[in-house]
Design a protein with these regions (language model features):
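Acidic, glycine-enriched catalytic cores built around paired aspartates
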Residues: 1-79, 83, 100-123, 185, ...
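Extended, highly charged
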Residues: 2-234, 256-311, 356-359, 764, ...
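Conserved structured core elements
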Residues: 15, 172, 200, 204, ...
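Structured, charged N-terminal subsegments at the starts of enzyme catalytic cores
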Residues: 121-122, 126-129, 133-134, 138, ...
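Structured alpha-helical segments in the cores of large, soluble enzyme domains
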Residues: 125, 140-147, 164-187, 339, ...
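Generic, well-ordered alpha-helical scaffold segments in large soluble proteins
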Residues: 209, 213-220, 224, 272, ...
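Short, glycine/acidic-rich hinge or "gate" loops at secondary-structure transitions
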Residues: 227-228, 287, 291, 336-339, ...
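Catalytic or ion-translocation cores adjacent to nucleophile or general acid/base/metal-coordination motifs
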Residues: 255, 261-281, 456-637
Length: 848
């Protein structure tokens, strides 16, 4: 579909439908709903015109009260603001649902990045054999995390699901009823969710979205690429899972919770198999076949509801093979495809559904190993160096009992290691086989985990676990090559890797990397680190797999994911694409079957075409490398100066929503590391950090320093070099376009009032100047007239969303100003700030 046709289609099936169904809100039979619907456009106009005139949010909201209401008391005014927030929250849900419902009509099976498009291109260029060869040794893995950017409670998620279907069918009556339900359903968790609640929220998507979307996508891959000699591996699409296993900074994730989540994953996939088998049996009603399937059905049922009954994936497959044998011999293979599809699901999802990972901070491990050393050796903790402690414990024959340790963290850490064996017995080895170490920047960080496993009674042959270092700060990335070089030459670790098929998984953190080094520097540092790690791995005969810790927005490694992976050069290992997906990105990018299938496809084809279709735009030459490196260093210096500004943390603390993230009850994890009352930059978690800039509509981490770097080289008369780089490098182009997406979601007029602030005025002007510079430089570089010029539909979608939430932003800033001035009821204004967080985050779809 051509761009103009797509834009017109979007106008008809998204914009127009939103206008029509939005009017249904006005007729909902709830308290003052019509009144709110009539007042809201006035608040929007006051905001739009007011900001253009340089008014503050306080002036805008007060003008609105004065001109359009007769409210007098503070209580009456804040009550109206709460009702407006509730109304806008539901408008956002409606727009989400309409846009999601239009997905299939706006995308076709032959779009760029689809399986069919890849097939057509491979056929034309005679690369089909190469594609099949690559498929044999390639996979994508999407790892769902529990990071708190997901603001819809489960009840609302289900309404969204039903609303989307009703919109697809244009069922006005059902839409009206669902909007009524939406009006009465709370959007806010009264209590902070437990890690188990978070896990159940994502398991909902596994059961009702990914079981179908991945199953259907694999069937399509088989149909398109399969031959009598080649069947694509069912492992080509894999799922990972962090809720209940990610302990980093979350004291509520206990060893017991991990066991419960693993069991929920096992039971959930068996429920899907049980339900799916009912449909299979409706077709395969033949003598002999039906008996085998009935027996399987009973065993599945018992495995779901009886604790002492277990069924393995192989057992299910064996029974399906038996049914197939009878089907072929006695019933002409009728409906064999139905049986085949079912068996493929079992091969894909096993009895684990998604692989549960454990993650913990290296500093926690060090304390645990110190504790163990003292207990086992009887020596003082500082009597040996860290390396000496590791060597001592490797020689020890001790088998630890977690209950022998008084320290709760030591006890919990050891229990979680013992539980790995149990989870592998119940869910299969794929149920849990990775231990991720946050903040890895030393060899000991990896060896500490190996030592703990050995002391928990695992023999060398039983350590069926990939130990995964996570390099996430500038310092960690700098050291990563040396760390891996040492590990690859360590006899103990080398032996362990041999048992793991000489495969090393390395995780790289885009979120903390960008927070630490700024957008351009972090992305370039990760790129060059991957190159060095690829080289050192190949030299040591190791197959390296990179696991990218990416968030929703460009400031946390998100943005155009397909373009990012398709732009990786041949100097970076491409054995597998693994990345984290979280919060809003789960609902907005993988939230329904069509979207999920499309986006799984995009990732899969990005990795395959990157290897098969060589392009000079992917590999950087020495001149291009030097140029990106210069730009990255200049931008890093600029960003570092900003971080060192005495007003940096106070600005976030006093002028943004940072302080309120932890109070929103959207995630189980605290919003900052450490328990101290004074906020330090290093204690800030990446999500609240990036999210707070997003709420201010400033998105600083997504562009700051980039424009300054471009201008610096332009002043040296080298802008033509950068233009050549932009045209010649897919990687650099993707970075520029992602940064422009961040800038397109900014709205500095919202905070113009801060420019005259006695304390923060100068700091605000630093931010604004760099935004103006970055925007001007990038438009000049790309020859665009407007940001995101090449993506008219995404730009249109963002514009509508920004229009919906503009009144919400005014309310949030109004409440923040009242709090800064210490005016009115503090508790009420704090609640206004928190409530407005939800709608703003949900509307932007990838803000944190």
């Amino acid at each position: 579909m051509l761009n103009d046709q797509k834009i017109e289609k979007f106008r008809q099936i998204v914009e127009n439908k939103f206008q029509i169904y939005n009017s249904l809100f006005m007729s909902l039979p709830y308290d003052k709903m019509t009144n709110i619907g009539m007042l809201l456009p006035f608040l929007y106009e006051e905001s739009k015109e007011g900001y253009q005139l340089g008014k503050s949010p306080e002036e805008i909201v007060e003008d609105f009260f004065q001109k359009h209401t007769e409210l007098e008391t503070e209580d009456q005014k804040t009550e109206l603001l709460f009702k407006i927030i509730q109304y806008i929250e539901r408008q956002v849900v409606l727009f989400d649902s309409i846009e999601d419902a239009a997905f299939q009509q706006l995308h076709s099976e032959s779009d760029s990045g689809t399986v069919m498009n890849l097939y057509d291109r491979a056929t034309q260029e005679h690369h089909l054999a190469a594609i099949r060869k690559k498929m044999d040794d390639f996979a994508i893995k999407i790892v769902f995390t529990a990071h708190p950017t997901q603001f819809y409670p489960n009840a609302v998620q289900r309404i969204i699901h039903d609303l989307r279907d009703a919109i697809i069918n244009d069922s006005v009556t059902q839409i009206d009823t669902l909007l009524q339900q939406l009006g009465k359903t709370p959007f806010v968790n009264k209590e902070r969710p437990t890690p188990l609640d978070e896990a159940m929220s994502i398991i909902y998507y596994l059961r009702y979205v990914y079981y179908q979307s991945i199953g259907e996508l694999y069937r399509k891959i088989k149909q398109v690429y399969g031959t009598s000699n080649f069947t694509p591996s069912p492992d080509i699409i894999q799922l990972g899972f962090w809720p209940g296993g990610d302990r980093d900074g979350n004291p509520f994730v206990t060893a017991d919770i991990t066991l419960k989540v693993a069991e929920e994953l096992r039971i959930s996939i068996l429920k899907d198999y049980y339900g799916h088998l009912k449909n299979v049996r409706r077709r395969l009603s033949f003598r002999g076949v039906s008996d085998v399937l009935e027996k399987l059905s009973k065993k599945l049922y018992a495995s779901i509801f009886q604790k002492d009954v277990k069924i393995s994936a192989q057992e299910i497959i064996d029974q399906l093979d038996e049914a197939e044998k009878i089907l072929l011999e006695q019933h002409n293979g009728l409906f064999r495809d139905v049986l085949d599809d079912y068996r493929d699901r079992v091969k894909i999802f096993g009895t684990h559904f998604a692989t549960l990972d454990i993650r913990q901070d290296s500093r926690v491990h060090q304390k645990v190993v110190d504790d163990i050393f003292v207990k086992v050796s009887g020596l003082a903790v500082d009597s040996k160096s860290n390396d000496e402690k590791i060597n001592y414990l490797l020689e020890s024959n001790a088998v630890l009992n977690p209950d022998d340790f008084e320290d709760e963290m030591t006890c919990e850490t050891l229990k979680s290691i013992y539980n790995i064996k149990l989870i592998q017995e119940n869910n299969g080895e794929r149920g849990m086989h990775r231990y991720i170490i946050s903040n890895s920047d030393e060899v000991k960080d990896v060896m500490n985990v190996y030592v703990m496993m050995k002391l928990c009674g695992y023999s060398e042959d039983e350590i069926n676990i990939d130990i995964v270092p996570l390099f996430e700060t500038m310092e960690g990335l700098d050291k990563s090559e040396e760390v891996m070089r040492t590990l690859y030459s360590d006899e103990v670790y080398k032996k362990h890797l041999a048992k793991r098929n000489n495969k090393q998984i390395i995780m790289l953190g885009f979120s903390d990397g960008t927070k630490d080094g700024g957008y351009l520097k972090a992305n370039w540092q990760i790129y060059t680190s991957k190159e060095k790690l690829t080289k050192i791995s190949e030299e040591n005969g190791m197959k390296v797999v990179f696991f990218d810790g990416r968030g929703g927005p460009p400031a946390r490694g998100g943005g155009k994911t397909h373009d990012f992976y398709a732009s990786q050069g041949n100097t970076i290992a491409n054995n597998q694409i693994e990345l984290t997906i979280q919060g809003q990105t789960i609902t907005s990018v993988f939230g329904n079957k069509d979207q999920a299938k499309f986006n799984f496809e995009q990732l899969l084809t990005a990795g395959i075409e990157n290897d098969v279709f060589k392009s000079i735009k992917k590999d950087l030459n020495d001149k291009e490398r030097q140029l990106i490196s210069e730009l990255a260093d200049i931008s890093y210096k600029k960003y570092s100066d900003l971080k060192a500004h005495p007003m940096f943390v106070p600005y976030l603390q006093e002028m943004s929503t940072l302080e309120y993230y932890g109070r929103t009850n959207i995630g189980s994890r605290p919003s900052k590391r450490g328990a101290g009352s004074e906020l330090k930059f290093e204690d800030l978690r990446a999500i609240p950090f990036v999210g707070s800039w997003s709420q201010l509509k400033q998105n600083v981490p997504g562009f700051f320093g980039f424009g300054f770097a471009l201008r610096t080289l332009k002043d040296q008369g080298r802008f033509d070099e950068i233009k050549e780089l932009y045209k010649g490098s897919d990687f650099f182009k993707t970075l520029v376009l992602n940064s422009m997406m961040s800038m397109n979601k900014t709205y500095f007029p919202l905070t113009y009032y801060m420019r005259n602030n006695e304390k923060f005025g100068e700091f605000w002007n630093v931010l604004f100047s760099e935004f103006e510079l970055s925007k001007a430089m990038m438009l000049e570089l790309t020859d665009y007239k407007i940001l995101m010029q090449e993506e008219p539909i995404n730009r249109k979608s963002i514009k509508i969303r920004e229009k919906i939430v503009l009144p919400l932003l005014s309310i949030q800033q109004y409440a923040l100003i009242k709090l800064q001035k210490n005016e009115g009821d503090r508790d009420t204004y704090e609640k206004l700030v928190m409530r407005s967080l939800f709608g703003n985050i949900n509307a932007s779809r990838n803000s944190a």
